[in-house]
From Swiss-Prot:
EC number: 2.5.1.61
Annotated keywords: Chlorophyll biosynthesis, Porphyrin biosynthesis, Transferase
Subunit structure: Monomer.
Annotated cofactor note: Binds 1 dipyrromethane group covalently.
Enzyme class: transferase
Protein name: Porphobilinogen deaminase
Chain's gene name: hemC
Amino acid sequence: MTLDQLRIASRRSQLAMVQTNWVRDELQREHPDLVITIEAMATQGDKILDVALAKIGDKGLFTKELEAQMLLGHAEIAVHSLKDLPTNLPDGLILGCITKREDPSDALVVNEKNQIHKLETLPEGSVVGTSSLRRLAQLRYHYPHLVFKDVRGNVITRLEKLDSGEYDCLILAAAGLQRLGFANRIHQLIPTDISLHAVGQGALGIECVSGQQKVLDILKTLEHESTSKRCLAERSFLRELEGGCQVPIGVRTEINNNELILEGMVASLDGKRLIRDIKKGSVSSAEEIGIDLANELKGRGAGEILEEIFKSARA
């Protein structure tokens, strides 16, 4: 028996819709007789724009409403930016597919007056816009002379704030800029020795109801094996550290032949402490590599850094 209809839950932001439309089009190409519909909605993270993401403090800021649609039987799948999807999913839901990763780098975007600068040459006191604690902590560590200011809203809104002079530059995900047609605004891809990217950054995660084999069979055409293995290691690293989307944890992964290399980082919010290391192993042991690296960093003080952050958030 085949599946006749597939309902996709999605955030309604411009980037989310670009990503979801891509998933729909790819699935439609492989399954031309399948009726595919999209239900777009706003999530808590989309609605609360006057508070820094870290202060809202909910791991499912951009996913809970989509997950509710699936659990209520109103959608078969949900499309997420994988970096927004918590590592522990609600009972009854699974991560059914991870798509091929786009460039996971962080990107520097500047306004007209700062075109002559790279990140490393920005003048003292330059205002850097970011909503990510991970980017904030790493950049404070390397460039303590810069001023960091929270920025919220969709990509277009953020670019408008930059161009109006509210910020000297922004740090955004390169993949999001490319998907929205703003690749020309990427002034510099930030090197990984300065900023490790977020877990899952650049990849899409498709969540679905567990036990729905027909849905999983349909999603197989979008699964990208090497991206999936890399993200499995990254997500197990994050899970073992008990971190969410709004913690200063960064990663980098690569696969050479059958060897998976995972680099991980935990930093304090003031930028004064940064713990970083690399773990290598067989691709077949991706999850174990992530767990082992997390425990190594814990042994070097990462646990204490994260506990301070969690305690501050609870206060």
